[in-house]
From Swiss-Prot:
SUPFAM superfamilies: WD40 repeat-like
PROSITE patterns: WD_REPEATS_1, WD_REPEATS_2, WD_REPEATS_REGION
Main location: nucleus
Keyword Nucleus on entry: yes
Keyword annotations of the record: Nucleus, Repeat, Ribosome biogenesis, rRNA processing, WD repeat
Disordered as annotated region, ranges: 1-161
Protein name: Ribosome biogenesis protein BOP1 homolog
């Protein structure tokens, strides 16, 4: 059964303002579109987008009616106007009209060229103008429907992807005007969306509406081909999508299904497999002998002995005997509070200080109306002997009030708070959340023959210098562990320090009473040459040095023999040097001589080659000194206390109380607000310089004396080395908010050093860039933990 709908197409005369000469305004593209449209009108049967079983024909009569035939499913174009009401007559003459329409279409195709041209122009104008509910807009497919999308290959991996956003939810672009980006990084604008009326008209008028889908990547409408529709139908019906696939192909038996009965080995059973086991026979005979001798007991005997040990079992016949007594009594009775015991004031002969004077007696009588405000509910009296004590006049009243309290006052139990000890411990973050920090031993630098006392790292983090009791200074390459240079000295090397200024290559070596300024000759050659030029000539001093300074320290250039080793300047002190430290800029350095009394600490200026003694009096045995990283402050640590001096004003700023027996070392935070102190009495002290002069936190993490502590320059980490051969790495976060306390969390205990003569780890130092820590020990090694 077919239906025929007629659409009247009225060709309007073009308006005069839109007319233009054909020879000037028509372009090549317009001519091509007109030819395509004429070809589509002449050969409607060649359209590959029509579904099977749907015949569509064009009829061009003198009345300019356009007719379509459709099946019962309703796939036909809508109609404009009120014509086409004769549906039953068309059904009866459907076959005759089809033949007439074919003939009329061929004859009238030539006569309707002008009408087709006019129609193509109207279609172009309708595409350029926005659609309305009264006009039908032709749907232009996004691709050629006659061309199979994956005709050249069997996969969709090589399809033409115009939107490069990838496999993401496309609803992310709902709020934007574009839907993605093309290969030229230009926005793909969303096509205009019609309203419900436009969708309804398209559904009525477009015969391909049912096979049109929307591409979510580009927003364009794609017309499904016959092959796509056939594939969808096969999938919906539960069949295999590929039509060429044979589901019932003959089975090819690649491997045999018959069970092979031949054994892998056909060795006859041994004779001993048919005979009883000799070892089991011996075991059974031993058990029988043990049972006869009474050494071994049967299961029944063991159970009988257990029952005898338990004894008879008694139980209550009536369980209510005890519960009845409990029900008769008051549940959970609260005992009466006891009266306070008498004190010295209630004695018949109290001490004089408990007696009231005139003023106290007057105040006691004044509070007669408010007895609860009195200090005592009675007035103390003094008698010479117990015989003179009269009867207590308030005895009956107090007994009566006591009975009232017991009878009328409610009693309640005070619940004691059972606080778990773990609840009071502050909750610390997990060490996994505080990474990175060193966890394993990566390298061991071997080469020294005696204990290594000090270690220092180059500012760039490529080289390492170490000083040992074997009177040598070794320069190592950190990455490979190779010893690049060894410098021999005349005495034990107590301390080494690399200049923190990256523009200079200088190592300060404290050996005996001499301070050596060494050029290691590693790294950039221009930097090495610049350092030699700086230390080559001594500047002229305008200020005459004091005799007190001349007797304490002397500057001199190194001898030619020492020059070959790399030593450039030698600063000779009058006492053995224990520690040397640099200022952050690399021009000043300080030395400590514990035996120097009031000249124990000296400050040297490298550029002017002069020294100065900052203190005129000795306020204790100086152990170590330190420069502030930002401010012109100088930290001096004695055995028990730490003093902070202002170098500009030359005055004492603060004195830190450590409450320790002996200070071994200290390190300051890069921001300069927190100080870490190590002591020989197994403690580490954290000082908040803005908070108090007493330790903010005392950490007892080691079992022996703590020799050294060090802060990292970049990461919130600090490390400590002790004589228990352990290096403990901790997290120390200092916040910019002054109201928030520092966060201190112990992270890792690294214990790989060996103990030699009660000594363990002697010094620790951090890598300037990486979260790596170096440690020196009495086992003549330097160890790197990463």
């Amino acid at each position: 059964m077919t239906k025929k709908l007629t659409i009247k197409r009225k060709v309007k005369e073009p308006e005069p303002q839109n007319e233009a000469p054909d020879s000037h305004e028509s372009s090549d593209n317009e001519e091509e579109e007109e030819e395509d449209l004429l070809q589509a009108v002449k050969d409607p049967g060649e359209d590959s987008t029509d579904d099977e079983g749907i015949d569509q024909e064009y009829q061009t009569d003198s009345s300019e009616d356009l007719e379509f035939e459709s099946d019962e499913e309703g796939n036909y174009l809508g109609r404009k106007g009120a014509e086409g009401s004769s549906g039953d007559d068309d059904e009866e003459s459907a076959e005759d009209e089809e033949e007439e329409d074919d003939a009329d279409a061929k004859k009238s195709s030539k006569n309707n060229d002008e009408e087709a041209a006019t129609t193509s122009k109207s279609i172009k104008k309708s595409q350029e103008k926005p659609t309305s509910s009264n006009k039908v807009v032709p749907v232009v497919p996004a691709r050629d429907p006659s061309k199979v999308e994956y005709a050249d290959s069997d996969t969709s991996d090589e399809e033409d992807i115009r939107n490069t956003v990838g496999n993401i939810p496309m609803h992310w672009y709902d709020e934007y005007k574009h839907i993605g980006y093309d290969w030229d990084a230009k926005k793909i604008v969303k096509p205009p969306k019609g309203d419900q009326i436009d969708d309804f008209l398209r559904k009525i008028e477009d015969p391909n509406f049912w096979r049109t889908v929307k591409d979510p990547l580009t927003g364009q409408e794609v017309l499904l081909t016959d092959a796509d529709i056939a594939l969808i139908k096969r999938i919906n019906s539960g069949r295999i999508p590929n039509e060429e696939h044979d589901e019932y192909a003959p089975w090819i038996e690649w491997f045999t299904s018959e069970v092979e009965k031949m054994p892998i080995k056909n060795v006859p059973d041994h004779k001993r497999s048919f005979l009883p086991s000799g070892s089991e026979k011996k075991t059974v005979s031993r058990m029988v002998h043990a049972l006869k001798m009474g050494w071994m007991k049967t299961t029944e005997e063991v159970q009988r002995e257990k029952q005898e040990k338990r004894g008879p079992k008694f139980y209550m016949l009536w369980e209510t005997d005890t519960s009845r007594e409990q029900m008769r009594r008051i549940h959970d009775p609260v005992s009466a509070p006891k009266r306070d015991l008498p004190g010295h004031a209630e004695s018949y002969n109290p001490p004089p200080e408990y007696l009231f004077d005139e003023k106290e007696a007057k105040e006691w009588h004044k509070l007669k109306d408010e007895p609860h405000r009195r200090k005592l509910h009675f007035m103390p009296q003094k008698f010479k002997s117990l015989r003179e004590v009269p009867a207590y006049s308030r005895y009956l009243r107090e007994r009566f009030l006591r009975c009232l309290d017991l009878y009328l006052c409610p009693r309640a139990k005070r619940v004691k708070l059972n606080i778990d000890a773990e609840y009071l411990i502050p909750k610390l973050p997990s060490p996994r959340d505080l990474q990175p920090f060193p966890t394993v031993e990566s390298l061991v630098y071997r080469g020294h023959t005696d204990l290594v006392r000090s270690v220092s790292v180059e500012p760039k983090g490529e080289y390492l210098v170490s000083g040992s009791d074997d009177k040598t200074v070794k320069i190592w390459e950190i990455a490979t562990g190779r010893c690049i240079r060894t410098i021999e000295t005349e005495d034990v090397v107590r301390c080494v320090a690399w200049c923190p200024n990256a523009k200079l290559s200088i190592i300060a070596v404290a050996t005996g009473s001499r301070l050596l300024l060494v050029n290691p000759k590693v790294g950039d050659k221009l930097l090495v040459k610049k350092t030699d030029d700086l230390l080559a000539e001594a500047p002229v001093l305008d200020v005459i040095e004091n005799e007190r300074i001349k007797t304490a320290v002397q500057w001199a250039n190194a001898e030619p023999a020492d020059q070959e080793k790399g030593v450039r300047v030698i600063i000779t002190h009058f006492k053995p040097i224990r520690q040397v430290t640099w200022h952050g800029r690399g021009d000043y350095l300080a030395t400590v001589m514990p035996e120097g009394a009031n000249r124990s600490a000296l400050i040297h200026q490298l550029s002017k080659r002069r020294s100065q003694i900052p203190f005129s009096k000795s306020k204790g045995l100086i152990q170590c000194v330190l420069f502030h990283p930002v401010k012109p402050c100088f930290f001096v640590a004695t055995q028990h206390n730490i003093r902070i001096y202002d170098l500009v004003k030359q005055e004492l700023i603060k004195k830190l109380l450590t409450n320790s027996k002996w200070i071994s070392g200290m390190s300051i935070h890069p921001k300069g607000d927190n100080l870490l102190v190590s002591t020989y009495d197994k403690k580490m002290l954290w000082f908040d310089l803005d908070l108090s002069t007493k330790p903010y936190q005392t950490m007892r993490l080691h079992r022996n004396a703590v020799r050294s502590v060090a802060f990292h320059l970049r990461y919130p980490l600090f490390a400590s080395g002790s004589d228990d051969q352990a290096v403990i790495v901790s997290h120390g976060m200092v916040y910019n908010d002054l109201l928030q306390n520092p966060l201190i969390v112990p992270l890792k205990k690294l214990q790989t050093h060996e103990k030699r003569e009660e000594f363990g780890v002697l010094d620790v130092n951090w890598h300037p860039v990486q979260p790596w820590v170096f440690s020196t020990g009495a086992d003549c090694t330097i160890r790197l933990f990463t």
